[in-house]
């Protein structure tokens, strides 16, 4: 019997995913993390990006906007700042938000506003990259 790992993805909005996986790929702060059953315990931050939950031939694509990742040998828990199924991303809305953030940054407002616009820009770029990957996989037109 193949080994699996329990996966829970939750955000302030509620539970996004609960199930088992053969492998989880998460956007860690220092780069992508590939997590298999019996992984060493780890607690790390997440950056905005694509979370892939692989079970057999099926892959579940989620988008997380930062958060905390806890890994135990038999369980992965994602406490996301916000999360959504990647297929639910509104590409036009993400592109408009990206352009608005770029405009705010170009306006050279104060340092706090610039940092907030930069964070928004990075989030929207990550959303658009997730949509692009889904398009390449044939999930989005």
UniProtKB/Swiss-Prot annotation:
Tagged with keyword Transmembrane: no
**Entry GO MF terms:** ATP binding; proton-transporting ATP synthase activity, rotational mechanism
What's its membrane topology?
Peripheral membrane protein
Q: What keywords would UniProt list here? A: ATP synthesis, Cell inner membrane, Cell membrane, CF(1), Hydrogen ion transport, Ion transport, Membrane, Transport
Q: Which InterPro entries match?
A: ATP_F1_dsu/esu_C_sf, ATP_synth_F1_dsu/esu, ATP_synth_F1_dsu/esu_N, ATP_synth_F1_esu_C, ATPsynth_dsu/esu_N
Give me the Gene Ontology terms describing cellular component: plasma membrane; proton-transporting ATP synthase complex
Q: Which cellular compartments is it found in?
A: Cell inner membrane
CDD domains according to UniProt: F1-ATPase_delta
Do you know which Gene3D superfamilies this protein is assigned to? ATP synthase delta/epsilon subunit, C-terminal domain, F0F1 ATP synthase delta/epsilon subunit, N-terminal
Disulfide bond entries: none
Role this protein plays:
Produces ATP from ADP in the presence of a proton gradient across the membrane.
The entry sums up its family as follows: Belongs to the ATPase epsilon chain family.
NCBIfam families, A to Z: ATP_synt_epsi (TIGR01216), PRK00571.1-4 (NF001847)
Task: Tell me the subunit arrangement.
Answer: F-type ATPases have 2 components, CF(1) - the catalytic core - and CF(0) - the membrane proton channel. CF(1) has five subunits: alpha(3), beta(3), gamma(1), delta(1), epsilon(1). CF(0) has three main subunits: a, b and c.
Name the UniProt record assigns to this protein: ATP synthase epsilon chain
Organism field: Acidithiobacillus ferridurans
Q: Which gene encodes it?
A: atpC
């Amino acid at each position: 019997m193949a080994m699996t790992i329990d996966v829970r993805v939750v955000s302030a909005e509620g539970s996004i995913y609960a199930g088992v996986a053969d492998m989880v790929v998460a956007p860690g702060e220092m780069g992508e993390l590939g997590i298999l059953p019996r992984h060493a315990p780890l607690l790390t931050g997440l950056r905005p990006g694509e979370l892939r939950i692989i079970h057999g031939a099926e892959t579940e694509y989620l988008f997380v906007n930062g958060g905390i990742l806890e890994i135990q040998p038999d369980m992965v828990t994602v406490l996301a700042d916000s999360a959504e199924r990647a297929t639910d991303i509104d590409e036009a809305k993400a592109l408009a938000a990206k352009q608005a953030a770029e405009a705010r940054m170009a306006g050279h407002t104060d340092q706090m506003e610039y940092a907030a616009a930069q964070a928004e820009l990075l989030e929207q770029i990550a959303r658009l990259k997730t949509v692009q990957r889904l398009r390449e996989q044939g999930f989005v037109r």
